[in-house]
């Protein structure tokens, strides 16, 4: 049985960045990814392939607490969900780490503070090529240095919109974005960034920024198409000693001194529960029964602001956000949330969600809309949880809360 110092399960922003941080210390590291490298192909930038055919989503289904099957928003590739994310890389606010009272209840404090993480935020912004501008957002936490790269310039339509917001007393700011707009960089500011894979590898995803650089070190190994079935403990159940992997139709075992599960909230939970044994009958690390509980996903709304008299010619739209209501709003003394621009919506994207609406109507809307992502916080609820069915299927129970914001 092969042996490593570290086994890292998952190659997304968590697992990939950890491998990058460990790469130069001489430790023998194995990265395990259940998928493969996402191919660079014309379909990367085709609306129908990405949004209608779901080309890059897995075929597996998860299930709600009512038993209804749904296709999860996960992407099993090297780089994980960062392969298709919108490239927004903001820091949490200082207060986010503290006890925060919401209209619907209390958001408990983290065991660490913003100040504990600030140096690591600074380093991560360098690694992920973050473009931004300090001093524009009134909720911004303290920084030890400027952003490593200047803010992404706003296109004229968006710049004019920001001026109108400022005249109303709001503080739109340049949203921190992880894209390669360095001198000689690959980014072409296209309309197929948010929600799409980047065909030219200009998005600051975990694949391009941390996994591939880590693999330049001979002590770092990547196994793709490697599904981790179980974590196996010593006979007394006190430590994990090996990982059971399904690869190329075979079941393999690999040992490690340290095993890190970084395969996402739901899949890490499922892995711990699948790994139940006589010493841990309810799953690993689950004496309290809390594994999988208090599942949170934010309260999210995609909003199109349509002016029928004013076309929006913007191509790269996702450059600004508003946090004026982050901690409270007019007549509402509780946190409300964040407004940020989406990548420019296209008619084909709308058609994938509303297939029975006339395409001419969807095209007219997309041509004249400014597209927003409106996000507020949900709160921990032990009944919102991830469980496994008797057949091993993943069940997710999530009931929205804190909706007044």
What is the predicted function of each stretch?
Residues 65, 101-228:
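Conserved redox-cofactor binding core of oxidoreductases
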Residues 6-31:
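N-terminal Rossmann-like FAD-binding beta1-loop-alpha1 element of flavoenzymes
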Residues 40-44, 81, 87, 96, ...:
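Short, solvent-exposed loop/turn and secondary-structure capping segments
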Residues 51-138, 375-377, 382:
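Redox-cofactor-proximal catalytic regions of oxidoreductases
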Residues 187-189, 234-241:
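A short, glycine/Asx- and small/polar-enriched loop/turn
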Residues 31-34, 81:
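Hydrophobic or amphipathic alpha-helical targeting/insertion segments
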Residues 24, 35-40, 217, 226, ...:
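Glycine-rich loop(s) and the adjacent beta-strand/alpha-helix scaffold that form part
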């Amino acid at each position: 049985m092969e042996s490593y110092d570290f086994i890292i399960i998952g190659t997304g922003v968590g697992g990939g960045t950890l491998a990058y941080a460990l790469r130069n210390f001489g430790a023998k590291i194995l990265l395990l990814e259940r998928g493969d490298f996402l191919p660079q192909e014309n379909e990367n930038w085709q609306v129908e392939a990405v949004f209608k055919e779901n080309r890059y989503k897995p075929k597996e289904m998860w299930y709600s607490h009512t038993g209804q099957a749904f296709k999860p928003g996960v992407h099993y590739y090297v780089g994980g969900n960062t392969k298709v994310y919108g490239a927004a890389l903001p820091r949490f606010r200082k207060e986010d780490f503290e006890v925060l009272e919401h209209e619907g209840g209390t958001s408990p404090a983290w065991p660490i503070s913003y100040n504990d993480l600030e140096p690591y935020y600074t380093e991560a912004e360098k690694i992920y090529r973050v473009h931004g501008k300090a001093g524009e957002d009134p909720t911004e936490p303290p920084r030890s240095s400027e952003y490593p790269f200047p803010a992404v310039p706003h296109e004229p339509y968006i710049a004019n919109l920001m001026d109108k917001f400022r005249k109303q007393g709001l503080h739109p700011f340049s949203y921190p974005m992880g894209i390669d707009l360095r001198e000689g960089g690959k980014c072409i500011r296209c309309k197929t960034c948010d929600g799409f894979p980047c065909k030219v590898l200009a998005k600051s995803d975990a694949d391009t920024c941390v996994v591939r650089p880590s693999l330049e070190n001979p002590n770092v190994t990547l196994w793709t198409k490697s599904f981790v079935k179980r974590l196996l403990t010593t006979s007394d159940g006190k430590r994990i000693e090996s990982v059971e992997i399904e690869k190329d139709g075979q079941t393999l075992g690999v040992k490690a001194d340290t095993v890190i599960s970084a395969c996402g909230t739901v899949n890490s939970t499922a892995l711990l529960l699948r790994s139940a044994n006589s010493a841990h009958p309810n799953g690993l690390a689950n004496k309290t029964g809390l594994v999988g509980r208090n599942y949170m996903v934010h309260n999210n709304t995609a909003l199109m602001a349509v002016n029928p008299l004013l076309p929006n010619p913007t191509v790269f739209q996702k450059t600004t956000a508003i946090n004026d209501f982050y901690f409270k709003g007019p007549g509402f003394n509780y946190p409300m949330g964040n407004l940020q621009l989406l990548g420019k919506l296209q008619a084909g994207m709308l058609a994938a969600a509303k297939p029975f609406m006339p395409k001419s109507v969807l095209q007219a809307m997309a041509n004249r809309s400014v597209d927003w992502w409106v996000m507020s916080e949900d709160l921990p609820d032990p009944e919102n949880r991830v469980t496994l069915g008797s057949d091993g299927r993943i069940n997710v129970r999530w009931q929205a809360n804190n909706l007044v914001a």
